[in-house]
UniProtKB/Swiss-Prot annotation:
One of its GO terms (biological process) is regulation of DNA-templated transcription. NCBIfam families: PRK00110.1, PRK12378.1, YebC/PmpR family DNA-binding transcriptional regulator. It comes from Azoarcus sp. (strain BH72). Belongs to the TACO1 family. One of its GO terms (molecular function) is DNA binding. GO terms for cellular component: cytosol. This is Probable transcriptional regulatory protein azo0574. It holds the Pfam family Transcrip_reg. The keyword Lipoprotein does not apply. The keyword Cytoplasm applies. It is found in: Cytoplasm. Transmembrane segments: none annotated. Its main location: cytoplasm. The lineage of its organism: Bacteria, Pseudomonadati, Pseudomonadota, Betaproteobacteria, Rhodocyclales. Keywords: Cytoplasm, DNA-binding, Transcription, Transcription regulation.
Length: 241
């Protein structure tokens, strides 16, 4: 068993993501564009693009928007050229923070990220200072009350890497990053629908924060996530609010 408040944290994070839907389309279009640029415009041959398209469809993005983003990535349409950038640092109580960006101006982006770290009690580190603390993987979260044995059997048969039962009754299925969509769809066909799922950088060791520390950490995470160039923010912090 693991994770004293995993379900609450996942629900809280999901709520914060829902509240930011105004920025979601912009971020998804960037990801589709860059995925197509890096690996080509065929989602069947480009797992990253397939995942980006699935996320866009889940947010009800119009088909034309998706297709135009792919064409900008492959050069069929003109558009802004985005570069990937990752910044690492520390939050409250030394919690690891990793910030993934897509930007057309790295000088602006690094200044914005550094300012957010400094303003809200964290500090930006050097490349690689916390990356080793995270694993690139898919994560599917199932609600408390799900049949653990049946889910475990179905998940491992579908190609999942691990199944973790948390203290709060929720169950986590871990997949490889590019196997995420296949495992998710296979489990849905078997009758198991995740409450939350994403490809993420999962912290290997968690830093539990409560009270003022949790509130301060939340402000730092919100500040980073609000930046236009930021796509994803990952942290080892578990907030007990």
């Amino acid at each position: 068993m693991a994770g004293h408040s995993k379900w609450a944290n996942i629900q809280h994070r999901k709520g914060r993501q829902d509240a930011k839907r105004g920025k979601v389309f912009t971020k998804l279009i960037k990801e589709v564009t860059v995925a197509a640029k890096m690996g080509g415009g065929d989602p069947n041959a480009n797992p990253r693009l397939r995942l980006a398209i699935d996320k866009a469809k889940a947010e009800s993005m119009p088909k034309d928007n998706i297709e135009n983003a792919i064409k900008r990535g492959t050069g069929q349409l003109e558009g802004v050229t985005y570069e990937e950038a990752r910044y690492e640092g520390y939050g409250i109580a030394g919690a690891a923070v990793m910030v993934d960006c897509l930007t057309d101006n790295k000088t602006r982006t690094v200044a914005d990220v550094r300012h957010a770290f400094s303003k809200y009690g964290g500090n930006m580190g050097t490349d690689g200072c916390v990356a080793f603390q995270f694993k690139h993987c898919g994560q599917l979260m199932f609600a408390p009350g799900t049949d653990e044995d049946a889910l475990m059997e179905a998940a491992l048969e579908a190609g999942a890497e691990d199944v973790v039962a948390n203290d709060d009754g929720s169950i986590e299925v871990i997949t490889g990053p590019w196997e995420f969509t296949t495992v998710k769809e296979t489990l849905e066909k078997a009758g198991f629908t995740a409450e939350f799922g994403e490809v993420t950088m999962k912290a290997q060791n968690e830093t539990e924060l409560s009270g003022d520390d949790a509130a301060r950490m939340q402000k730092l995470l919100d500040a980073l996530e609000s930046l236009d160039d930021v796509q994803e923010v990952y942290t080892s912090a578990v907030l007990d609010e």
